């Protein structure tokens, strides 16, 4: 009964090495009317295959950079064929990045990364958000991280007001559970911001002054860290991200102008 909701889908059964355990379950499910296949070689063979693929996956990339709240993730979600690393990791790659999410472990992340990218042409120019090597608890594959360093770099800019609004829309800090989770993270900022600033943030959060709370975090924590980490970067293009629909069009135009972009037909969905 547990599997009945999945009867219309193709199921894959596996064990460690693809032996009799998974074979017998496959036969049983097939006799019960399920569409089912056995994973040849088992999970261990699958993992070797995934790791071999990730070791050499270095596609040409367009990497979106910009300060927290500028809209990078929103654009990645809207651009066809992009790779959303934060979605794969289920983490926003920041100190508050796990709020509302269930971060994945390394093996799950790598498996999902493989599923997302293995069918893409190796030379297809792809959008990705600029990240450090670590996203939450997981590490980006080394070859892909190297491709990000060598990719085309675009700097996105937006006003403080716009960034605060977008962060507020993303985190929705209005229910008690979310507020509790955010407040519980604040002590981890004492070393960077000092006790007084952290107490100020806690007070603003308790008073539901979310715009002020986010503004201070951006000015005193996120922006200085971003500027320090990106101080040596040189960008191929700078774009305003005030109007994300226009920014999306500008990005697709930039993509199409590149000498190697693999997919020549990228369209904006209306």
Q: What do these predicted regions represent?
A:
Residues 1-10, 48-51, 174, 178, ...:
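Helix-loop module immediately N-terminal to the HCX5R catalytic loop
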Residues 1-39:
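Catalytic cysteine-centered active loop of the rhodanese-like fold, especially the PTP/DSP P-loop
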Residues 9, 58-62:
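Pre-Walker A (Motif I) flank of P-loop NTPase domains
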Residues 21, 62-80:
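Glycine-rich phosphate-binding P-loop
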Residues 36-38, 61, 82-84, 153-155, ...:
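Conserved beta-strand scaffold positions in the cores of enzyme catalytic domains, especially
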Residues 38-51, 168-172, 182:
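Long, charge-dense
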Residues 80-147:
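Conserved nucleotide-sensing/catalytic segment adjacent to the nucleotide-binding pocket
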Residues 147-152, 157-270:
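Conserved NTP phosphate-binding and transfer environment spanning the P-loop NTPase/kinase superfamily
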